[in-house]
UniProtKB/Swiss-Prot annotation:
The keyword Cytoplasm applies. Residues 41-48 are annotated as: G1 motif. Microtubule-associated force-producing protein. Residues 211-214 are annotated as: G4 motif. GTP binds at residues 41-48, 142-146, 211-214. Residues 518-610 form the GED domain. This is Dynamin-related protein 5A. Residues 142-145 are annotated as: G3 motif. Keywords: Cell cycle, Cell division, Cytoplasm, Cytoskeleton, GTP-binding, Hydrolase, Microtubule, Motor protein, Nucleotide-binding.
Length: 610
């Protein structure tokens, strides 16, 4: 069971070392979940004397006004009988104090280091561990004494500042409140009882300690309070008799003071029946036992919190990415790895692993055929246009058998309109590839970490796509131009010949320009153009895929990689510039993760019985 208090002691020290003081922050706090005993009392309530009685040593700064200006986490460790007593501070890990006067001075000096030689307060705790055969295993948090007025040298807000600090500790459900109240004052005016009642109205977490019982007016006693009739708490009140100022001035040691305290309760008729549960020795043992019980009950919940928070911290650190390498080689490698991640995500979109690539097929299967169907060949092949072009093609010598030059001009003028849908298909695929680049950039976590690199990679990828688009447009339009430049002769050879059985032409040279003749030419040309459209409907997608999609998968960032190899260290560094807020957040998260992992290891190492 003693291991449990030691466990919490270790975790508390780790919290302070790694900056977790339980303050409100954007980071998860382990400090707030740890069971602790907070010592609360007004100034001159005897709070310091109670702590020194529990420890058995004079070690706390004394004086008028606010003496305790930072939380003091006091961790007591029982060691073997005959061993020498010593103290250690967390901020001086390799120094042992055997002189407790020096301990008092170091508490004062460390307070001044944080707050300056003023009467300001600080929430950053001081950790003091005391090792002695005369103590029980126990952890207490000594908080600044509550006050009602600011004195000279203190800010006007000091009353509220102290109250807020005390409240921040005792309002936590895992905090045990040790409320120190002087018996020679009306309990209704007790600062400790007042504030503890506000945060613990049922009294389930509050342990009442009554000091200065021996200083009460003659004819009065504290029996009603100690027996719980005046103010009931879940745990019995404990009375203590501290050393007087005269005793302190005479350096009366704690052993003698404890003996006199026992004698007082045993010999005073009003308290004799309560003597077995009075005094600082009983208080220390009771607190140690109660703290062990609370820790044991809270450990499973703390373990669950630690495991959950570790997962959350690791996830956020993953989202923020790794810190930047210092050397040029490391920077170049980091950039290359990030670019490869982006490139793979882009390929995954094209290959169907991620959504988006199917839209390219939609261009080929729907948009291109629909655009080809919308071409108005009937306008090109109207009677007037056919007659006009054939007549112009004949010139001053009319054709003898078939108007070949007219055919060619009509076919060329029809096929040339296919360039529009072909070019539109190239542009549509280019637009989709750009969209996939932007998607891949947004899905590459490391690029979110480096805005400069994100812009450069995006620009380089789009530049590559534009070069590929230009090449695709050239190759695709060349397919259309090839169809215009050379006709498929076999198509015309296979057309049925319009001759009678005698082999004489049906149309004479004089009626070759009539509507029937021109209609026949239009029908023939339309059949040929439709055949070419069917061919291009298959070949245009092949050209686009070869020149754009395939090339984008193969060499999207090749030009960027070439330029990257030429960059100087300064330029590489600029690509990996991070938002300072992200850098600070990552550092804070890494420290907090270290704390939680340390706590997890400490808990796992302790064999505690359920």
């Amino acid at each position: 069971m003693e291991n449990l208090i030691s466990l919490v002691n270790k975790i508390q020290r780790a919290c302070t070392a790694l900056g977790d003081h339980g303050e409100n922050s954007a980071l998860p706090t382990l400090w707030d979940s740890l069971p602790a005993i907070a010592v609360v009392g007004g100034q001159s309530s005897g709070k310091s004397s109670v702590l020194e009685s529990v420890v058995g040593k004079d070690f706390l700064p004394r004086g008028s006004g606010i003496v305790t200006r930072r939380p003091l986490v006091l961790q007591l460790h029982k060691i073997e009988e005959g061993s020498r007593e010593y103290a250690e501070f967390l901020h001086l890990p390799r120094k042992r104090f055997t002189d407790f006067v020096a301990v008092r001075k170091e508490i004062q000096d460390e307070t001044d280091r944080e707050t300056g030689r003023t009467k300001q307060i600080s929430t950053v705790p001081i950790h003091l561990s005391i090792y002695s055969p005369n103590v029980v295993n126990l952890t207490l948090v000594d908080l600044p004494g509550l006050t009602k007025v600011a004195v000279e040298g203190q800010p006007d807000s000091i009353v509220k500042d102290i109250e807020d600090m005390v409240r921040s500790y005792i309002e936590k459900p895992n905090c045990i409140i040790l409320a120190i109240s002087p018996a020679n004052q009306d309990l209704a005016t007790s600062d400790a009882i007042k504030i503890s009642r506000e945060v613990d109205p049922t009294g389930d977490r509050t342990i009442g300690v009554l000091t200065k019982i021996d200083l009460m007016d003659k004819g009065t006693d504290a029996v009603d309070i100690l027996e719980g009739r005046a103010y009931r708490l879940k745990f019995p009140w404990i009375g203590v008799v501290n050393r007087s100022q005269q005793d302190i001035n005479k350096n009366v040691d704690m052993i003698a003071a404890r003996r006199r305290e026992r004698e007082y309760f045993n010999s005073t008729p009003e308290y004799k029946h309560l003597a077995n549960r009075m005094g600082s020795e009983h208080l220390a043992k009771m607190l140690s036992k109660h703290l062990e019980t609370v820790i044991k009950s809270k450990i499973p919940g703390i373990q669950s919190l630690i495991n959950k928070t570790i997962a959350e911290l690791e996830a956020e650190l993953t989202r923020l990415g790794k810190p930047v390498a210092a050397d040029a080689g490391g920077k170049l490698y980091a950039i290359m790895e990030i670019c490869r991640s982006f490139d793979q995500i882009f390929k995954d979109h094209l290959d169907g692993v991620r959504p988006g690539g199917d839209k390219i097929y939609n261009v080929f299967d729907n948009q291109l055929p629909a655009a080809l169907k919308r071409l108005q060949f009937d306008k090109q092949l109207s009677m007037e246009n056919i007659r006009k072009l054939i007549t112009e093609a004949d010139g001053y010598q009319p054709h003898l058998i078939a108007p070949e030059q007219g055919y060619r001009r009509l076919i060329e003028s029809s096929l040339i309109t296919i360039r529009g849908p072909a070019e539109a298909a190239v542009d549509a695929v280019h637009s989709l590839l750009k969209d996939l680049v932007h998607k891949a950039i947004s899905e590459t976590l490391d690029l979110k970490q480096y805005p400069g690199l994100r812009v450069e990679v995006g620009a380089a990828a789009v530049d590559s796509l534009e070069r590929m688009r230009d090449e695709s447009k050239r190759a695709t339009l060349q397919l259309v131009d090839m169809e215009c430049g050379y006709l498929t002769v076999d198509f015309f050879r296979k057309l049925p010949q319009d001759v009678d059985k005698g082999g004489n032409p049906t149309h004479s040279i004089f009626d070759r320009y009539n509507d029937s003749y021109l209609r026949r030419i239009g029908t023939t040309i339309l059949s040929y153009v439709n055949m070419v459209c069917a061919t291009l409907r298959n070949s245009i997608p092949k050209s686009i895929v070869y020149c754009q999609v395939r090339e984008a998968k193969r060499s999207l960032l090749d030009h960027f990689f070439t330029e990257l190899g030429k960059m100087e260290t300064k330029r590489l560094s600029s690509l990996l510039n991070e938002d300072p807020a992200i850098m600070e957040r990552r550092s804070a998260l890494a420290k907090r993760l270290e704390l939680y992992r340390s706590a997890q290891a400490e808990i796992d190492a302790v064999a505690w019985s359920k």
